[in-house]
Every structure is written in structure tokens, then in C-alpha cells.
Amino acid sequence: MTPETEQLLRRWYMGQLIVLFGAAFIQLFTFDGGVFFPVGGMQLLIWGLLAWWPAAEEDQAQWWRLRHVNYYVQTVLQFTLLPILLANLVAWLSQLSWLDEQGLIAVGMAYLMVAFVPVAVVVTKPIESVIGRIAVLITAIFSGVVSAQQTFLILPNLQAPSVFEMVSDTGILGALGFVIAVEVLLRGWELTGPSWRFNRQAQTSLVVGLIVVGTAFSLWNAFSAGGSWATTFTHWDFQLRSATWKMFLSGLEPGIAEEWLYRFAVLTLLLQAFRHRRRQLDWAVWLSGGLFGMWHITNAFAGQPLSATVEQIIFAATLGWFLASTYLYSGSILLPMVIHAAIDILSMMASGSQTMVKPDAFEWQTIGATVIIFVGITIYFLTGSRRQVIQAHVNQRLLAQ
């Protein structure tokens, strides 16, 4: 990232702060006779000054620990609350009779796709710890950006059309915004973007094999109606119980955002962190998949049965290992994105649900078989000539400076 680009993003960041915090002060002062202004205004002032600090500071050793704590605090606060500040601005502007509220809401939802870019560069980029970088990526940044449009519409005085609410609930706009923000952030950390083209050194037959495995699993996972090993590959139900745009976009969102998070950002950071280790690939692949699995534990807090969540953690980890090896060998981030999206879209449309139910005994058996297959494929690609192809691709493309 050039100094000119970074300076431009800093100006964008400061201008965004002035507008959003200014509108918040006005609303506090005018709402209900300003009764909340003394306390709320003081809190907003303190937050605003701390938010301004990263943009105004120069390279210096003073207050080093406090400044770095502030980077984490501002990352959490701004990635979480920026949509609410923007919604407040839209609500205030909509009070002007000559401005259309629905048009303002549409502009606000679109702006949220890029609003986090200056925040990422000014506030999150200075974080140097690999653990810290991964921690903020998989928590505040992912949840804040992907759910930004949904958070934006949380204010009761914004009346959005039903189609706006449907799109915001799917998180698809947030997923696209996450792609943009994380791409810029990793470039700020001096890491290259993901590769899109297939690796010319990879054997075509093996890449085709990965595509076949991904396709076959997507179809079996969604449409197999068998309840035993004798029927699981012979009994099928191809009925789509909820073939709606909402289900399609809800399944597409993790295919984009989660792959961008784990197969691009987290995997690249781990590859960089272990670049001097002999087992660099093993550490990066197995850790990224394990993190991907454990990351799904939060679904238990959303009302999903604990046994279903445990099953999902195991499945997500093994799928993460398979998708990581698929990406590293094929060379294209599109392949794991398409496989992941196909799995989620087809399963959601076929079942009509976005959550998992309590697994029965046979489902635990199929999970065990899935673990054996995906772990076996991962080990296969991390050994022999396949490993050499992956290592060359990592050195020449993913970690090239």
C-alpha cells in the first residue's frame, strides 16, 4: 500500500468520523429535549477522541501499550457500532421532507459495503501480533461487517421495504463488504491477495478429482434420503422445500465470506507466521481447519442443540482441512468458494432450514466416514509431489512480496 493511498484512507476515516459523530451529537441534543445529552454526549466525546487518536498520531514510542490497546478497542467498537451511527445519520436526514427515506436506506446499505475500509487501515492495520490479527478477524471484523446491513436496520424509526430486510438478513451484502475490507487490510499487512487462476503446475486429473469429490458430497449431503448404509447411496429425495432467494443468498454468504476469512485471510496469516518452520504447510492447514471448526461453537448460543453443534464443529473442521488443501493445490480461491456455497445452498433449500437438528446414530456414523475421507484427502495432498506443488505455489504466489 503506497503512502499516498494510506493518507487518502486516513482522510476518509477522519471525514467519516466527523459526519457520523456529528450527527450522533445532534440527535442526542434534540431527542426528548436533550435529556440524554449530558451522559450520552460525554460517552460519545470520549469515544470520538479515542477513535481520532489512531488517525492523528505519528510514529512514536510514547504511550505504546495504551495505543495498542486502543487499536483493539476501536476495532471492536467501530466494526460493531458503525452501522448504528450510519443508521442514525440516515434517520436524521430522512426527517428532511425533500429526501426519500427508502432512497437514503438504499444508499446507506450500499455505503456499508465500503465504510469499513478506512477503519481497517487506520485502526486495525497497526495490530502486529498474528494471534491478535486472527482474533479480531474471526470475531469483531467478521461479525460486524457481515451483519452490518442487518444492524443498520435495527433502529425502529427506519422503515425499510421487505426486500431490503430480506437481503440484509442473508448477509450477502456484508459478505461482499467483508471481501473488500479484508483484501485492503491484508495488503496493508504486506500480504498478497488470494490467487484466482488455477495453478499450472497442478495435475489436471487431481483438480478434476477434487471438483468431483466436492460435487458428489454436496449432492449426497443435501439429497440422500437413506437412513442406513444400505440405503444412503440408493434412496434420494431431490425435492427443494425452500427454493427461495433468501435461502440461496443465505447459503451463498458463507461460501463467500467464510472462505475469504479462513481459506484466504487466516490461512495466509498462518502460512506467513510459520514460513520458517519445516512443517509450515501442516501447521497452517491443520490449525486453520481446527479454528474453523471451533468457530461454529457460537451456534449453540443461537438455540441450536448442543449435540448438533458438536457435530457441526467436527464436520466444519474436516471440511476446512479439505477446502484448504483444495485451495492450496488448485491455486484458485474460487474452487473452495463454489464447493462451500454449493454445500450450504443445496442443504438449506432441501431441508428448508438454516440450522442443524439433533443427529441420530446413523448421522454420527456418516460424520465419522466424512472425517476419514476428508482427512485422508488432506494428508494425500500434503505429501509427495502434491506437497511440492503446494509449497512452490505458496512461495511464488501467496507469500511473494
Predicted regions and their residues:
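C-terminal membrane module of polytopic membrane proteins
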Residues: T2-R11, L20-P38, P54-A61, G331-Q401
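Alpha-helical transmembrane segments
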Residues: Q7-I26, M42-G48, Y71-N88, Y111-M113, ...
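Alpha-helical transmembrane segments of polytopic membrane proteins
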Residues: R10-W12, G34-L49, D100-A115, F164-G177, ...
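Juxtamembrane helix-loop-helix connectors linking adjacent transmembrane helices
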Residues: F25-V35, V90-G108, V119-A140, T151-W260, ...
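Canonical alpha-helical transmembrane segments
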Residues: W47-R65, A115-K125, V182-V184, R263
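Hydrophobic alpha-helical transmembrane segments
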Residues: L206-V207, D282-L287, I313-I314, L334-V338
